[in-house]
Design a protein with these regions (language model features):
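Conserved catalytic-site loops of classical short-chain dehydrogenases/reductases
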Residues: 1
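Cytosolic catalytic headpiece
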Residues: 4-188
């Protein structure tokens, strides 16, 4: 933060609340895949489908997935479109594919007890979750996390010492993800 001029600095001394965006401000801004569950007999094709679609996206989570998967055979995608609320649909090898947050799973996708438990575990851990279904069959669940900046907690403590009463964390991420980062930083 850069403050210029004595009036601005004086006015800033009366600030009692500071709102921070999470991604790239309090976290490093480079999410990484921490967990991957596959529910398919053909993991090679499944990972190629995932990589082929995610390579078309500039979303930070898509970039993390592509990096994690490494080089994969690229399959032609058709009828690709972004889903409002967090996902993408496409047709690959004549099959309908949906990738995104849990909301992209249609009601036709029936989760096994293992899949439901894996999703619940990642949600409870505060991971950002990306799922992929092919023809309404869940095939991939990914847990993705961004690391808190090493000096963020100390900087927040300094703001408190300077008299800032409230430090607020703002994010469009899943509530559990935001809670995990807030706990790590000592925010309430």
């Amino acid at each position: 933060m850069l403050l210029k001029g004595s009036e601005v600095i004086h006015d800033f001394s009366r600030v009692d609340t500071v709102v921070f965006d999470k991604t790239g401000t309090l976290t490093i801004g480079h999410p990484e895949v921490t967990t991957m569950h596959l529910y398919t007999d053909d993991s090679e094709t499944t990972l190629s489908i995932l990589s082929s679609i995610e390579k078309e996206s500039d979303h930070p989570l898509a970039k993390a997935i592509v990096k994690h998967l490494g080089p994969q055979p690229i399959l032609p995608t058709e009828k690709t479109h972004v889903l409002r609320g967090g996902g993408i649909q496409a047709v690959v090898n004549g099959q309908r594919v949906a990738i995104g947050n849990r909301s992209v799973l249609s009601t036709a996708v029936q989760l096994t007890p293992k899949q439901a438990a894996d999703l619940a575990e990642l949600e409870e851990a505060g991971q950002s979750i990306v799922v992929m279904s092919v023809e309404n069959q869940l095939q991939v669940v990914l847990g993705i996390a961004d690391q808190v900046r090493p000096n963020a907690k100390a900087h927040l403590a300094q703001l408190k010492q300077l008299g800032v009463k409230q430090l607020v964390l703002l994010s469009g991420d899943h509530a559990k993800t935001v809670e995990r980062v807030a706990q790590e930083l000592g925010l309430t």
